[in-house]
């Protein structure tokens, strides 16, 4: 059994990032609801648990009905790290004081480390003129600790949060008000690695080859001799899911590629060629363009569009499954960011942002059980898994594409005309990103961006072409850089590149006369517009 860290989830949107950072340190981690009982915690320790991390939350630590940390967490003798709400709960339950703050902190902050603790000693992003080591971190809190519990010492502070970190090193208890799990906290990865390795004593015995072996064994045990049907979207997630399942059960898997009329330019042909040449998997191509477009007519609300697309996918799969003798499982390439944004995480505590067409809630009429082998993985882990499975890098590192396709990149009602314009504009954008190199890194801008696409805006603007007046549509370009897709920054594309893309779209795509560039980060914006 792997050495492991238990993460107790209190509802933060980024709880799974904690698990990701722990795994990057080569240590296996599991997430469980924060309200597990004492017996569960003691049983975990009896099985060799090395440490516990308490997540953040959107709730208040002193709000009536807020979850409390199981008392056993502080009694079983393993190191504990509290993050944000986890820090406040630790302080409150161990005799400190938590108060509502008039100065709420959301975003970038600079933290001063104190006391030379094992967690923060020697970590600094810059040094002040007075010689104090400072950390660049990400804050997201309203409440704050105003009095340390007995036995604790000050570990960190900010200008507006005098107690931004605390530690009782005799018991191995550490807590920080900021979020070390997000990439905006520059030393966060090092902090978490230091906690699980130096403080908890984990050696780092978890890796992708082990994960593949364990996942293959789980799939075989779960599926047995049953037939499995998997829906291909053309994206990385369903591709890797197909490769993993195929390794586990071979010809028991049949892939169904549904063309809903909302794919990228020539994507249907590319998917069929790619899967036939590289995977040797049974694949069925279904052209359901008329079915999907008909159902979307007159629908403008993004949630309604997603749900319609999800429902139609289910209907198509049900039809195809009925043609397969023995098909009892529907496999999907659902990954964790899909789950967390739908508040479908297994702990069920996160706040919903948007629904995803391939998350939870399959109707009973489908009569298929759900197989989601990538449900606990982030996008970067999925890519790592794909390479380890032997898939071509050019397939694995393709930019992600949402299951609803262009349906959520056309704002408002989806029309065939809009889809055709967007397809061509998007293809030009991606082509130029692939052709343009950054001289500093030698990489193309397609490689330097994590996701890039065009968005169709159903509004018209006045323009001039030749000697004539035009009144045509607008497209927005979106390009982001991110490590885990839970947070993202807009990509600083060179102005000459943006100018070239704009010129080509306006001149080559009749019906578009204005191009704009989206400079919003996540948060507060999501990566997709809908």
UniProtKB/Swiss-Prot annotation:
Catalytic activity of the protein: XMP + L-glutamine + ATP + H2O = GMP + L-glutamate + AMP + diphosphate + 2 H(+)
InterPro entries to which the protein is assigned, alphabetical: Class_I_gatase-like, GATASE, GMP_synth_C, GMP_synth_GATase, GMP_synthase, GMPS_ATP_PPase_dom, NAD/GMP_synthase, Rossmann-like_a/b/a_fold
SUPFAM superfamilies: Adenine nucleotide alpha hydrolases-like (SSF52402), Class I glutamine amidotransferase-like (SSF52317), GMP synthetase C-terminal dimerisation domain (SSF54810)
Enzyme Commission no: 6.3.5.2
Pathway participation: Purine metabolism; GMP biosynthesis; GMP from XMP (L-Gln route): step 1/1
Disulfide pairings: none
Transmembrane residue ranges: none
Pfam families tied to this protein: GATase (PF00117), GMP_synt_C (PF00958), NAD_synthase (PF02540)
Keyword Iron-sulfur (UniProt): no
One annotated Gene Ontology cellular component of this protein: cytosol
Keywords: ATP-binding, Glutamine amidotransferase, GMP biosynthesis, Ligase, Nucleotide-binding, Purine biosynthesis
Domain called GMPS ATP-PPase: residue spans: 206-398
Function: Catalyzes the synthesis of GMP from XMP.
Name of the molecule in the record: GMP synthase [glutamine-hydrolyzing]
Organism: Bordetella parapertussis (strain 12822 / ATCC BAA-587 / NCTC 13253)
């Amino acid at each position: 059994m792997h050495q492991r860290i238990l993460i107790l989830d209190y509802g933060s949107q980024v709880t799974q990032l904690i698990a990701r950072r722990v795994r990057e340190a080569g240590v296996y981690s599991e997430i469980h609801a924060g309200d597990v009982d004492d017996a569960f915690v003691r049983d975990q320790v009896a099985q060799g648990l090395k440490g516990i991390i308490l997540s953040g939350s959107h709730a208040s630590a002193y709000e009536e009905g807020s979850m409390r940390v199981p008392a056993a967490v502080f009694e079983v003798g393993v190191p504990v790290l509290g993050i944000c709400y986890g820090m406040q709960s630790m302080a409150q339950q161990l005799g400190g004081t938590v108060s509502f703050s008039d100065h709420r902190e959301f975003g970038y902050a600079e933290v001063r480390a104190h006391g030379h603790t094992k967690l923060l000693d020697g970590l600094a992003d810059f040094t002040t003129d007075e010689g104090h080591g400072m950390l660049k971190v990400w804050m997201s809190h309203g409440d704050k600790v105003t009095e340390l519990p007995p036995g604790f010492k000050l570990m960190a502070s900010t200008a507006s949060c005098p107690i931004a970190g605390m530690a009782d090193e005799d018991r191995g208890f550490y807590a920080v008000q900021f979020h070390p799990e997000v990439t905006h906290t520059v030393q966060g990865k090092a902090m978490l690695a230091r906690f699980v390795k130096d403080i908890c004593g984990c050696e780092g015995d978890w890796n992708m080859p082990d994960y593949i072996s364990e996942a293959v064994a789980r799939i075989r045990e779960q599926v047995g001799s049953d037939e499995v049907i998997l829906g291909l979207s053309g994206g990385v997630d369903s591709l890797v899911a197909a490769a993993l399942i195929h390794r586990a059960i071979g010809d028991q898997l049949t892939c169904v590629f549904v063309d809903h009329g909302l794919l990228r330019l020539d994507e249907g042909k590319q998917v069929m060629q790619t899967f036939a040449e590289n995977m040797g998997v049974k694949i069925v191509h279904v052209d359901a363009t008329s079915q999907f477009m008909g159902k979307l007519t007159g629908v403008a609300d993004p949630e309604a569009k997603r749900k319609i697309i999800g429902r139609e996918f289910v209907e198509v799969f049900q039809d195809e499954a009925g043609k397969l003798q023995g098909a009892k499982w529907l496999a999907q390439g659902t990954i964790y960011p899909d789950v967390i944004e739908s508040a479908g995480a297994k702990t069920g505590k996160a706040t919903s942002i948007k629904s995803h067409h391939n998350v939870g809630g399959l109707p009973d009429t489908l009569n298929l059980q759900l197989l989601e082998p990538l449900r606990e993985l982030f996008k970067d882990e999925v890519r790592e898994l794909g390479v380890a499975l032997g898939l071509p890098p050019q397939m694995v590192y393709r930019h992600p594409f949402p299951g609803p396709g262009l349906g959520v990149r056309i704002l408002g009602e989806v029309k065939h005309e809009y889809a055709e314009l967007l397809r061509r504009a998007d293809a030009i954008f991606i082509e130029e990103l692939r052709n343009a190199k950054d001289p500093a890194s030698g990489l193309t801008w397609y490689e330097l961006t994590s996701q890039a696409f065009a968005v169709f805006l159903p509004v018209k603007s006045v323009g001039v072409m030749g000697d004539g007046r035009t009144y045509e549509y607008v497209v927005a370009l979106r390009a982001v850089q991110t490590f885990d897709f839970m947070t993202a920054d807009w990509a600083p594309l060179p102005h000459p590149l943006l100018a070239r893309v704009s010129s080509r779209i306006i001149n080559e795509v009749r019906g578009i006369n204005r191009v704009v560039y989206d400079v919003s980060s996540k948060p507060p914006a999501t990566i997709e517009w809908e």
